[in-house]
Amino acid sequence: MRTFALLTAMLLLVALHAQAEARQARADEAAAQQQPGADDQGMAHSFTWPENAALPLSESAKGLRCVCTRGFCRLL
């Protein structure tokens, strides 16, 4: 009976350890997705409005350019 209890306890510990490793792997993966990697930092999007845009632009807004990088946008 004592052997059965020890085997059951060991099996339970192994199962809990495997479950903890799986949770840690998921947490590490989620943290890696949230942090911008080296390849993401160089990515930027740029938008320009042509002179014949569908919406009429004021004289000061013609040729206005928006550059968006990860986290913020700025007008040029």
UniProtKB/Swiss-Prot annotation:
Disulfide bonds join C68-C73. There is a cross-link at C73 (Cyclopeptide (Cys-Arg) (interchain with R-65 in subunit A)). There is a cross-link at C73 (Cyclopeptide (Cys-Arg) (interchain with R-65 in subunit C)). Residues 1-22 form the signal peptide. GO terms for cellular component: extracellular matrix; extracellular space. Forms a cyclic peptide with subunit B (BTD-1), subunit A (BTD-3), subunit C (BTD-4), or subunit D (BTD-7). An additional intersubunit disulfide bond is formed. There is a cross-link at C73 (Cyclopeptide (Cys-Arg) (interchain with R-65 in subunit D)). Pfam families: Defensin_propep. InterPro entries: Alpha-defensin, Alpha-defensin_N. Belongs to the alpha-defensin family. Theta subfamily. This is Theta defensin subunit A. It comes from Papio anubis (Olive baboon). The lineage of its organism: Eukaryota, Metazoa, Chordata, Craniata, Vertebrata. The gene is BTDA.
